[in-house]
């Protein structure tokens, strides 16, 4: 699954490379990210509009919370992911990318939404270690990926430390693999980077598009790196800007973690 953020679309990848993306649903607002809802095939929790909603198998949305409704500038949700302990995390940003207007939110299993970080401009990720004890978060506008310790029971974050600072391009979507490596799309550089847990650069994958945006490790063995790209803002988009790419890699990723609500999460 992937989202086309600004059009509000949730899309499924086709079986063949020449087939079009299959539409699942379209919301009347930006759709930043989704995670599967545990025990409910075809149901999703989403970072959308100014907050969080559930999407049922018919594509209908049921809103959980809209924490950015009263922000001083127009806001939207951006990237997000479920952690290994069943919580869902997502960042917000200003429509015009106003500096430090964004936040990182955590949707707990009991349905409560907590703002856990402020003063972010364009949050991307987060990504988590396999045990959920480490979180990586990019602020794309600053070119920085930070690493946070996470209390696995509560989801509380400890003090951050710098992990990666890019000199060219901006860190965008991220994921981790089973060896603890961090993969990040590098917007503006036409690349994907893999970093070892110590922050050293391990691998660079060139992508035939200038703005790689989101990524995941999937396929039957978890060794297919899927990379989305965008053509927004390009004066002269190339033929593959906006395409989705697949690259075989050596280290697999883990299956996508679901959101595991501790309350009854029936979508309408």
Which residue stretches match the model-derived regions?
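Flexible "stalk/tail and boundary" regions
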Residues: 39-43, 57, 105-111, 193-203, ...
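A short beta-strand motif characteristic of beta-propeller blades
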Residues: 19-27, 62-70, 112-118, 159-165, ...
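Hydrophobic alpha-helical segments and helix pairs
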Residues: 56-116
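A short loop-to-beta-strand structural motif that recurs across blades of beta-propeller domains
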Residues: 9-11, 51, 102-105, 144-146, ...
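Loop/turn-rich, solvent-exposed surfaces of beta-rich toroidal or solenoidal domains
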Residues: 143, 148, 164-197
């Amino acid at each position: 699954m992937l989202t086309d953020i600004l059009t509000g679309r949730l899309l499924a990848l086709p079986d063949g490379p020449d087939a079009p993306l299959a539409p699942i649903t379209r919301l009347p607002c930006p759709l930043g990210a989704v995670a599967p809802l545990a025990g409910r095939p075809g149901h999703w929790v989403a970072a959308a509009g100014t907050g969080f909603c559930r999407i049922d198998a018919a594509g209908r949305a049921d809103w959980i919370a809209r924490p950015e409704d009263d922000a001083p500038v127009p806001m939207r949700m951006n990237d997000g992911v479920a952690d290994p302990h069943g919580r869902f995390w997502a960042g917000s940003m200003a429509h015009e990318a106003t500096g430090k207007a964004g936040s990182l939110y955590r949707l707990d299993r009991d349905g409560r939404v907590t703002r856990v970080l402020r003063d972010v401009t364009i949050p991307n990720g987060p990504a988590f270690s396999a045990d959920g004890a480490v979180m990586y978060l990019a602020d794309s506008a600053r070119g920085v990926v930070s690493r946070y310790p996470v209390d696995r029971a509560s989801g509380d974050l400890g003090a951050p430390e710098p992990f990666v600072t890019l000199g060219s391009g901006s860190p965008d979507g991220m994921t981790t693999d089973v060896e603890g490596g961090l993969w990040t799309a590098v917007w503006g550089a036409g690349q994907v980077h893999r970093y070892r847990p110590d922050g050293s650069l391990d691998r660079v994958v060139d992508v035939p598009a200038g703005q790689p945006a989101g990524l995941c490790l999937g396929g039957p063995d978890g060794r297919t790196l899927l990379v989305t790209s965008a053509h927004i803002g390009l004066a002269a988009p190339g033929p593959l800007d906006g395409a989705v790419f697949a690259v075989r890699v050596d280290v697999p990723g883990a299956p996508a973690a679901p959101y595991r609500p501790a309350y009854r999460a029936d979508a309408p």
